Amino acid sequence: MFRKISFVMLCVMILAGCAASPTPTAQTKNLIGKLAYETAPQFTEGELQQLVASQNEFASAIFAHQAEAKENLVISPYSLYQALSMLYAGAAGETASEMQQAMRLPWEDARVHRLVNALNQRLLNSAGTGDEGSQAFDLQIPNALWADKNGTYEQAFLDILSQNYDTGMKLLDFKDASAAADAINAWVEEQTNQKIQQLADPAMFSADTALALTNAVYFKAAWRYPFNEAATADAPFTILNGEQQSVPTMRLSEMLNASITEELTMVQLPYAGGTMVMEILMPSLDMWNDPAALAEFWASPQGLPELQPENVSLSMPKFRIETLTMDMIPALNANGMRLAFTDDADFSGISGDESLYVSTIAQKAFIDVNEQGTEATAATIAVVTQKMAPGGEPLQITIDRPFIFQIRDTATGAILFIGSVMQP
């Protein structure tokens, strides 16, 4: 059997000019949906697996597009997908249909919101329990919406967000762009352990801004089998042009799920306290240098081999990646989501106003992998504006050339982060 590669943590801001909703109380200065957060959403395991499959297919496609530059990369398809799900709650007509296609949603109805909630809760609950006394990992998936204090919004939109994403709207005066950016940035920095800073730029806000939507994913976990820090030493790493560089390389001897084929070396590193793993995938240099073969590898549902328990002697570089702001619109365009970024967009479900379109979707991300474990986080901004107008010898696995990594929950299959290391 094979699994498909899929898509590291995200924060999305959606700004919009809007029209028709409840009035906040002076006490809370919040807009709250009428429906309480659903802590026990109804779902079948089949539905949940359909959602995970759609997210993972989306993740593969987005990563394949972003990885074309062949640079160090980390993104969070999980957070991007969740942010798009919240935006989808306000989409209508052909705009909604294109988003459904791009997100690989198998349903036309609104069940995606209930299932996103269910998957979030499944993952968060698994983070709270360690196995055999081990320390549970830290996983946070918070949401926050920020509304212009004079704006009005559709009650149905607010209800979907309160019931499935556990958020209302905090009121801001977007005319004071600097204060609005400061408030949102403070929230983002707190949720990402200060790793994602200055996400919101005052230039994003104006008198026409009505809504900012933020989602963050933060993950931190120790390895189940830590690397021996004393064994870390410089070792050669061959980059794609054939040049060798000396990089700090960690070493571990342990029973691990692994596979070696002519085209791909793969090893799975479990985290302590649950079902989360990091999977390291090292394609052959021939595959890296053959765009057609690499594209087929990303696109194929048979992209990943079945892993087997092996006595592994592993060498791999430690690495830390902090991306610059990445424009995600080209990747979404390439996956069929086009109308949302044009004057023909229809986000009337947000406010009843049809003159809204998405002008920006960008993401920043961070990951640090060392002998003790992993810390990863990401943030994305989407701006919606008004139209202006075992056994035997150890299996030797040496990660000494460009590789791909992904952080995945083995219980659900959900991929939280994916990236590539071209030059540690």
What is each of the regions a protein language model found here?
Residues 195, 287-288, 414-415:
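Short beta-strands and strand-coil junctions in structured, solvent-facing domains, enriched
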Residues 70, 109-284, 307-390, 394:
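Non-catalytic, conformational "gating/processing" segments within enzyme and secreted inhibitor domains
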Residues 74-96, 268, 393-424:
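Feature captures eukaryotic membrane-trafficking machinery centered on endolysosomal pathways
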